[in-house]
């Protein structure tokens, strides 16, 4: 798998993108650790905080097509640099917010838009445009693993900071770490080499978007990714609450999130390898089907520390490993010239699901006292996602660019 990255500069580009994603995704995927401290500090309630987090899920996805389009048109450097600055600003502002609207601004808008601008659509799009075809699948897996490794590092780190110094200091530390990642942007800001003369003529961004929106395979891919966003956002936001309902210490939640991240490092690398060998739609089918089975296992198992850790490892293996095969299908259908934009649109579908997963989780807890109905919805959506991927066509359209 890694042999394809031995070409000059391939590892530098790949690791720079992975490093940026480690910070932006590590920050986003660990926000659930702040729900209880925010509730205790502000008295706003879980529903209000869940709403701010849900707005953040949607904003993170909504910025993806726009950030991808700007990066495709003008280059990724300014987009990534601005995103990191905005993420740092949102994190630094949050301790000063004591209202629902304030949290929506800091966490739901600034932090979410900033991390979204420094996330998959821009990073995978920029790296794919700068790497040869043979290296793209492996690079996608490594970049995705960087995001998962961020969750593995950030979850226990932020939990320790919360316990030792309080949640406000943890937020300010997050802002400082984000700023420290800005030098990596320079690697991806370098201009693209001119395309070879025999390359397919560029049909333009708008024409590519129109073709994607009307393509049945692209529509089915987005439906599956909606389900992915639903349960990832639900777990990221409400896993600490589920752990508390089971009478277990908060450290179980932070370590479960860390295990999810660590397992997905291996899952992402394996997904990148599978994309290079098998049809991506079958990779996605088995990933989504396994999630439904893992949730059934969790519901039937006794609620102990070990159960949460096994559940986290099993679910974590496919957590964000859906990104390489999903991005690969978009690239196969439409080429890589506007991959940042078109994959960004797919990520928007993911985060619309994320909005419902984060918000409905808080609503279910308030209304029913537990997350039972959310788990059942999660099983149904994961099974549906597995099935809708099977009819997808993995063949380039005639006008695919790049």
Locate the predicted segments by residue.
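Helix-loop-helix hairpin linking two adjacent transmembrane segments in secondary transporters
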Residues: 143-190
């Amino acid at each position: 798998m890694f042999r394809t990255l031995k070409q000059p500069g391939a590892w530098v580009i790949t690791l720079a993108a992975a490093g940026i994603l480690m910070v932006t995704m590590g920050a986003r995927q660990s926000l659930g650790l702040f729900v209880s401290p925010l509730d205790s500090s502000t008295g706003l309630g879980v529903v209000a905080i869940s709403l701010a987090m849900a707005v953040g899920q949607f904003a993170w996805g909504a910025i993806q097509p726009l950030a991808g389009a700007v990066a495709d048109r003008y280059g990724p450097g300014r987009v990534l640099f601005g995103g990191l600055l905005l993420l740092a600003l949102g994190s630094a502002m949050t301790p000063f917010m004591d209202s629902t609207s304030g949290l929506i601004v800091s966490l739901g808008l600034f932090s979410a838009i900033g991390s979204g601008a420094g996330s998959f659509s821009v990073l995978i799009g920029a790296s794919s445009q700068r790497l040869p075809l043979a290296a793209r699948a492996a690079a996608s897996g490594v970049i995705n693993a960087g995001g998962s490794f961020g969750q593995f590092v950030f979850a226990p780190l932020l939990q320790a900071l919360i316990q030792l110094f309080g949640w406000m200091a943890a937020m300010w530390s997050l802002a400082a770490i984000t700023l420290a990642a800005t030098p990596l942007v320079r690697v991806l800001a370098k201009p693209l080499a001119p395309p070879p003369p025999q390359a397919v003529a560029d049909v333009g961004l708008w024409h590519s978007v129109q073709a994607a929106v009307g393509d049945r395979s692209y529509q089915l891919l987005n439906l599956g990714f909606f389900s992915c966003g639903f349960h990832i956002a639900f777990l990221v936001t409400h896993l600490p609450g589920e752990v508390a309902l089971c009478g277990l210490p908060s450290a179980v939640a932070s370590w479960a999130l860390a295990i999810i991240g660590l397992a997905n490092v291996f899952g992402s690398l394996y997904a990148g390898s599978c994309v290079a060998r098998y049809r991506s739609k079958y990779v996605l089918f088995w990933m989504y089907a396994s999630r439904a089975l893992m949730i059934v296992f969790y519901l039937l198992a006794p609620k102990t520390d070990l159960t949460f850790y096994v559940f986290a490892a099993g679910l974590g293996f496919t957590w964000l490993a859906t990104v390489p095969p999903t991005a690969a299908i978009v690239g196969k259908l439409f080429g890589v010239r506007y991959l940042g934009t078109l994959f960004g649109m797919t990520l928007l579908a993911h985060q619309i699901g994320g909005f419902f997963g984060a918000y409905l989780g808080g609503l279910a807890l308030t209304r029913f006292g537990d997350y039972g109905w959310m788990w059942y919805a999660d099983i149904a959506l994961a099974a549906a996602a597995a099935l809708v991927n099977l009819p997808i066509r993995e063949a380039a359209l005639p006008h695919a660019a790049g």
